[in-house]
Amino acid sequence: MINKNFLEEPNIVDLAKEIFKEVFQNKLEIYTRFSLLSDDLYEADTINFILADGLGYENLNSTDSYLNKNVTKSINTTFPSSTNVALSSISFMKNPIEHGLIGYYMYDKSQYGLINALNWNEDNKNLLLSDHFQKQNSIWKIFKENKIYASNFQPRNLVGTPLSDCLYELSSTIPYDDEQNLLELLSESTILENRFNFIYYPLIDVMAHIFGVNSEEWQIEITKFEKLVNEITNISNKKTKTIISADHGLVNINTENRHDLNYSDDLQIYGDQRSVYINGSKESVLEAFSQIPGVLLEKQELSCLLGEPTNEFLKSIYPDFCFLVEDKNIIYPKHLSAQLNGYHGGLSQEEIKIPIIELSNY
């Protein structure tokens, strides 16, 4: 059974809105549904928001990391639990069905077909220039218009990519090379005057994908991250609040639970490998997934997780069905073949629950 109240529960969009509302010190009206953060947030001169890719609540809780002592709550990430979906939801302060980036892979029925919506290519990146996306204001554009001193720290290889250009303002984006370089940049006098810093940190996710959650390599990365966030929080003499969350957690998938999917060309298979979007006839879908453990959702059930499309653009990317692969299992459609250890995209507690971690120097 799916959680029909999923969209009513606190999620990463609610967290982002609460942070941004305080960045503006209530000078900009931002509607919030919940109070997720500690009261001392309102004392902060500088607010850091670190998005630790892959640092799921259950994953972190399985370690003896000191960060567990600073976890104040766990909330939901987006559905599906994919990086591009969560990052877009933060920047636009909207749920996926509202901003339009609804999966790792998407399928545009009207023009572009299958799209890798994390790594856009020359053939389909112009979809991001459509009216639907261009009419939306990211928080970074709002910061710029309101003269808020804010910086967005991204790994250098991500700056200038189609997704980055869609979500962020180039003038406030600062590339970094590694942890030491990040600390040096945050120590610069102009940055120390910032009201807000957003830091995207991908390495925990990388280690989990390649080596698996709880692997030695993953544990080493957790330890490095602990040290980094402590230094970031104490880098300034100003009152600094650091809030850490994630886009998803990960699950390790054994080789015997990885299923190659055979299907005819009358089906379009996309989305993620744990939450699989499908276009086509129900008969063909049932045949293709007959040997795959999981449950098939039709549009009405899917709307409890994703919401309903409200315009023609959203209807053109909305799937006919979604197959939720059973926990500890994964499928390989025709366009994906990489053999990893850790995966995400599904609805398990490990994937969907993310922590709110709060640190301060006051």
What are these regions (language model features)?
Residues M1-Y362:
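Feature captures the catalytic ectodomains and active-site-proximal regions of enzymes
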